[in-house]
């Protein structure tokens, strides 16, 4: 069985992407069922968002500007999970970092 806790890592930054509010609510319910708190608060009591960080302590939290920069721009040491695909049992739930083909060579997640 797939769990959120399986991604707790001491070496990588772990981010879960939510495509919509319903996906985020499902994530919060699953996290709470696994005993994961949102910095001491039950996740289902928090506002939904598009990206959630899983901390090495096993807690989850919102992502600020620095975390968003890391999510979008860091190539190594970052795990990005599409929670919608993960929760549906899809095998391709990891979001890969790819360099854009644009002229400015800015990174692009696909």
Please give the residue ranges for each predicted region.
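Structural boundary micro-motifs
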Residues: 1-110
């Amino acid at each position: 069985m797939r769990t959120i806790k399986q991604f707790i890592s001491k070496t990588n930054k772990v981010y879960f992407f939510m495509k919509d509010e319903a996906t985020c609510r499902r994530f919060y319910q699953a996290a709470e069922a696994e005993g994961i708190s949102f910095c001491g608060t039950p996740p289902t009591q928090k506002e939904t968002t598009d990206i959630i960080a899983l901390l090495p302590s096993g807690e989850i939290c919102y992502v600020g500007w620095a975390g968003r920069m890391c999510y979008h721009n860091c190539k190594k040491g970052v795990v990005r999970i599409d929670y919608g695909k993960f929760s549906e049992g899809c095998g391709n739930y990891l979001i890969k970092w790819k360099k854009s083909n644009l002229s400015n060579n800015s990174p692009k997640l696909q």
